Amino acid sequence: MASSVTACQGASPYQPRNYQLEMLEASMKENIIVAMDTGSGKTHIAVLRIKAELDICPPDKLVWFLAPTVALCIQQHEVIASNLPAVRTRTLTGLDKVELWTEQSIWDAVLNGYRVIVSTHAVLADALSHGFVKMSRLALLIFDEAHHCTRRHAANKIMRDFYHPTLTKSGPGAVPRIMGLTASPVVRSNHQELLTVESNLDAVCRTPRVHRQELVKFTHRPHLQQIWYTPTDPAGFKSASQTLGALYHAWETLDIGDDPYIQRLRKSPLDDTALKKALLTGKTYCREQLRRFVDRSRHIFEELGEWAAEYYIYASIKQLGDRVRNSYMSGDWDEAEKAYLVDFLSKIPASEIQLALNDPGSFRISPKFESLLNFLDSLDEREFSGLIFVKQRATVSAMTSLLSVHPCTRERFRCAAYVGWSNGSASKDILGDLLNMQLQRDTLDDFRSGRKNLIIATDVLEEGIDISACSVVVCYDKPPNLKSFVQRRGRARRKQSTFAIMFPTDDASADVSKWQDLEQAMIEAYQDDERQLQSVSALESLDEEVMERLTVESTSAVLTADMAMAHLHHFCAVLPPQPYADMRPVFSFETNEDGLLKGTVILPSCVHPKVRRTEGRRWWRTERAAMKETAFQAYKALYEFGLVNDHLLPLTKRPELKSHDLGAMPSILETSEQYDPWIEWAYSWSSPDIHQSRIVVRMNEGRGDELCMRLMGPTYLPPLSPMTLFWNNSTTFTVTFEAAERVPLVPLSSVEDMRAITALYLKATNSRVCSSERDFTALFAPDLHHTELKGWLNAYEGCDPAMEVYSRGHNPLLMGVVRDHSRYGEPFLFRKWLVSDQNPSCSVVELECAPFPHRRNLLHRQRLANSQVDVDEETPESAAKNPIVAADACTIDRLPFTMAIFGLFISAIVERLETELIATRLRETILRDVGFKSTDHIITAISTPFAHALTNYQRYEFLGDSILKFSVSCQLFFQHPNWHEGYLSEGRAMIVQNPRLAKAALDTGLDAYIVTKRIASRKWSAPLISEKLERVPAKRQMSTKVLADVVEALIGAAYMDGGHATAQACIRRLLPEINLHAVDTRTATRSVAPESARHMMNERLKDHIGYTFEDESLLVEALTHPSCDYDSTTQSYQRLEYLGDAVLDMVIVSAIFNHPIQRPQGDMTKIKHAVVNANLLAFLCMESATSEEKLDVAQTSKDSFAVTTSQESVELWRFMRYRGQNLNAARDASLARHRALRDEIASSLLHAPHYPWHALSRLNADKFFSDIVESVLGAIFVDSGGDLAPCEVFVERIGLMAYLRRILDQEIDVRHPRSVAQQLAKTNIQFVLQRVPNEEGGASYQCSVRIEQAELFVVTGCLTAEEAEVTAAVEAIKFLTRDEGSTPLNTS
């Protein structure tokens, strides 16, 4: 059947090696046979070659990978599919019954949509011979175990019958490129055959030439050991084993005339010829079954001994009986043949074998097997992993059983059998084949994982099959040829491993050096380095002087060739570290006709493509000199490209990234005093240009009478927005201001009257003794003409004794404020008169009053029983009993309280006017070029939280922070196309850090306009002209953070006022170095994508993203992981990921901020952090998939097939371009956790009232999953010319916006479990993390939870520190809420 595996299980750690890149480059220039030792990474070179070919070939071309066995096809397909997850690949083997596909339509359907096919040689040879596949459709042919391409092998048939004729007829453009892979190009110990293999494959044999030392470093040759044994007498079996002797006697005396086949032929006169042939040859189906069974039994006796032979005979007879009883057999075998075989074997005295024997002497074994046991017993390895090669399949099953039960081995070895997937003649055998093919499916995985540590196998495991490096390999029989010797030895590739060969004591050809000598002769045929090793060593000892020199005039810094290597390595060492990527420079060399060398160096993929690859300029005799000169040229190019400063050092943590020297800025700074607009008003009264505004006060939104007043000032009055004042929980006052108008010719007397009226209002509502000064800067009066003010003042100024008011029968609704002089004039509100008639001659008059309201800050709603009541506010005594006061001790103000109440509003109005004047001044001075339409947003941005104003900057600071980060990121990205992500991140950090923003506030004078004064305090007093004229300028203390916050808040305010354009103008005013308008987003330097990018980045991906790129190189770059070192023309995605991170922040923050439900800054910050959480982005990346149709072939009857269709999901992560088995393993581990947690996380995102912190922490996805989302987002932003709209579409497409809307609409709880636990504990709760190393060199994490230094519990066995902390917090929540009905956080 076809294999469609997408993950390579148990992949061993793998890192890019120079010699593999060398072989890749060689294969791109010509057809080659890669000849390297087993385990040195030939398959990974093939994977790189496939990637490169898919990048350049048309999309209708195929890459065809050929392997000699089905098992090897399955394994190699797993490796290819794991490394090319976005490419559709499949296997075609006999398991698919390919030999029955006899129609072109079937082949067309099978190959439709696939780019890489893995098959045996015979499958492709047959397909080519029948014309189902054309040679012209193949782009690349890869021959694994290429030494098979000789004589009549199917591999050679492909080349001889199809490749070479097509090449001769149509030229090289009509045939595929060729790559061969082999560890032993000479099969039969004849090194001359190398030339034949090269000719047949139209390729030249290559081993890594320059990097031979690296190849040796990674390839471990085992210790070679001989195991001698005394051979068994072949004729001794008759007397040694009763069961085997009886079987052999029964076979020798078998009468062919009793065979059912012979009897059937005798009954039919038409079958006379067949009868004569059968009698002459003695071959019938039953006799062949018995003959092979007897031969195998004898072989097992000779190889393993009597016990194994008897076990094999007994187990085979039992198996046959079970099959007959279960109707297992089918086909042409009739009932008579069944009965005949069963009857024959029933006469053999085979008794049941005892397996649980403790005495080694009970196991009658052969001298050969005893030698093997002695050898195995001599091994002293804690981590044993071994492989035993035997000749026959029957020996595999018998030896596996014997080793599994023998007392000397059963406790030490965990054995498994492996014979591959091609049944061969065993498919016709129903007797003596004890191996269950299904049981070996997991054998290799079990061996890799350590569940099995010893495999007994036939030669199927010689070639190609990827098994873990073994510490011991035993050849139970001599290798038949040099190829087997090399291949088997290559399996023992652990350090200090052993390769053992068993020899009989009478073998004259046991000289192991025979194979070693032949192998050395073969190597010398294609490896110049080995033949010329001494001359090369002599050359390298030469002292070649490299005279290159670079001097920087401005600093006198000098770079010489001798220093260049150290400088270049240092430059790479300080690049942003990346897991799975080698950050070292990679050197390679080319040789000219004179044997001279020229170097090339390739830097890590985060470096810009223009300077990533540098070639030397001269030819040298030694590698050392070539490396020096190449390193010099590379570092010189980095300097000229702006990645190294004038001191010839990398820019990281250097002044080049610091636009301002901030030094060590303290956290608290001395700043200008808050700008006081009343000072200017005080001076303006000397020659006033009087303006006034009509004020209308309405109670409860207009239900009731209006109170109309006037506000007068000596200069222009800015427009004031309506104000809502909260009297109590049921009463509000709305204060509106009409447009101010200029009032000419106001007499001085009228101004004085207004001063007196203002003082009257302020005194009427104040229990404190008021100042006698009346030179107020802002004046208030009733809405009367100025000529009427004197009469009004005479009517309402002063007070009357309460008894006098009582005697006049004054209207209670027009009563003024009651003042009790027995209590030092304490004010009360009149309720009613109380008259006592107990003494008729002298009635007692009293007043029932209400307490005078203490609240002064009417801008905020009254907060009853709230622990957060302001310190200067008291909870009203509305529930207290109304006080009774004596009338003769009281006076009552003439100004009715219905009018006097306005005095309580004056402080709020004056404070509001003051803030408006500050904002207006700021708008007209520092921010005059920004283009604010009004001051409303400015007021919010400059009001600090401790001013207790109606609004403060916190929400705008949240918005402005993201806008600033976004703007700075864009500016640096487009302005510095040569900078890698490390420089960009550091440059951004320098600009957006609090000290830089605080300095911007100080440099522009913004600090003076930050409102910190407490609004509407009970100690408030009206500003006076005399005080303001005498005011001495002072300083105030302010934190660096407040200054920075206001800068960010103003940026947010500008965005709210006029969108991105106004925000950019504000940034430009406060931070002159950021001018995004001057940057052309269309001219950013981009990587040069390979021509083939359009083929790899097919329509599936474009549909997936939902955006069509004008410049597809951006998409290629967005999907290029830093480990992708094989493509030096494309930069890794780190720059785009850096930009996409800021774009994502901007998209998310805008959605949060503009939601109808306004949330405080803290809640918005929590939501943002939850939504852009890397694990959530990674989960959505894993979930983001498009569906496409997949064609396949299904068998409908014995000989017919039909095309079937199905849907296949293609996830976004599959398109990432990378290299490395360690990344594969990490990716597959993340995907396995995703499969385990998917339902839980998906359900939480759709239905849970809480954010799935716990499940996401257990997901622990590798960072590259979330990086892909951000890098694609950055690519869309760049390609669209800086348009956020298509970015929002992509964020919507992956499902992030839908979840954000659910969080906002349904108020999902996004608090982190640690925060919830800390709130519940109401005391000091500690989470103590600890890394716990394990024996394998890894580590797990544990977290202990402590309250008041007492340990509650410990969570252990977590994959990461984050998972440990979150799990511990969840358990703490359960503990702290154990007595409650529910918990505040979902702990599932």
Curated annotation (Swiss-Prot):
Cellular compartments per GO CC: cytoplasm; nucleus
UniProt domain Helicase ATP-binding: residue ranges: 23-203
EC top class, as a word: hydrolase
Binding site for ATP: 36-43
Gene of this entry: dcl2
Residue ranges of every copy of the Dicer dsRNA-binding fold domain listed in the record: 564-658
Keywords: Antiviral defense, Antiviral protein, ATP-binding, Helicase, Hydrolase, Magnesium, Manganese, Metal-binding, Nucleotide-binding, Repeat, RNA-binding
Name assigned to this protein: Dicer-like protein 2
Lineage: Eukaryota, Fungi, Dikarya, Ascomycota, Pezizomycotina
Motif stretch (DEAH box): 144-147
A GO MF term: metal ion binding
One Gene Ontology biological process: defense response to virus
Domain of life of the native organism: Eukaryota
EC id: 3.1.26.-, 3.6.4.-
Pfam families named among the record's database cross-references: DEAD, Dicer_dimer, Helicase_C, Ribonuclease_3
Entry cofactors: Mg(2+); Mn(2+)
SMART domains: DEXDc, HELICc, RIBOc
